[in-house]
Swiss-Prot record:
Family according to the record: Belongs to the short-chain dehydrogenases/reductases (SDR) family.
Residues annotated for NAD(+) binding in this entry: 21-27, 46-48, 70-71, 97, 165-169, 198-202
Domain of life: Eukaryota
Residues passing through the membrane, by range: none
Protein EC: 5.5.1.35
A single MF term (Gene Ontology): isomerase activity
Keywords, comma-separated and alphabetical: Isomerase, NAD
Organism: Nepeta racemosa
Coiled-coil residue spans: none
Assembly and binders: Forms homotetramers.
A Pfam match: adh_short_C2
Name the UniProt record assigns to this protein: (+)-cis,cis-nepetalactol synthase NEPS3
Amino acid sequence: MANNSVMMKKKLEGKVAIVTGGASGIGEATARLFVKYGARAVVIADIQSELGRSVAESIGKERCSFVQCDVADEEQVKSMIEWTATTYGGLDVMFSNAGVLNSAAQTVKDLDLPLFDKVMRVNTRGAAVCVKQAARKMVELGRGGSIICNAGSSAVRGAHGVTDYVMSKHAVIGLVRSASMQLGAHSIRVNSVSPMAVATPLTRNQGISTPDDVQKFLMPFISLKGVPPTAEQVAEAAAFLGSDEAAFVTGHDLPVDGGVLCMPFLLGSA
């Protein structure tokens, strides 16, 4: 039993990974878990410089670094990926996780287009930039790799609000499916994780800041009872997709949502 535990903890042994949006929430949980599972190096890429450096230092500077990076700026992403590959001798896993969510209702009739552009810039353009540049580096290195995007449960259905966010996440699924087909010849796998909302800095804009908020507003729509959603659960899914355990998995969206897709989800009408 002990041997199995040790093996599981080393599922990412020797791998070099990048986690965008890694300074908080799901990204932070993933960076910590990747190191726990034996990753040789994890680079946190985020615009939150002070917080990102603090997280990297708490994980350990010998295994974790921080690079300030705006994921929608292609030159910054390209530079960050080049620095990672040069510093650590490769790139095995890219987790495109950075995202934003407006506090406005953003219904179709009242869609604020400047806010819409902000969401699409980070969630859709940012994901495309990260996938593109990671793919280029992985093809150049010639040893395959795993690219993971954070799509979300909003990526496969509509909603009564946050139209811009829903649209941005639908686009991520299209990106994952297309990239998986195009990059398979290079032994590069492309998948996504789709969490239900957990209490992270992102969800605060929608009034979900604590586990109690999750319990009140979201759990009624989840079929699995007694298991509150956490960032660590999503991190485990990302670790699986980044590891050799998922060696024959590509083009897949892995829901981490407690069965929310099995039930009506009418946000705002409860």
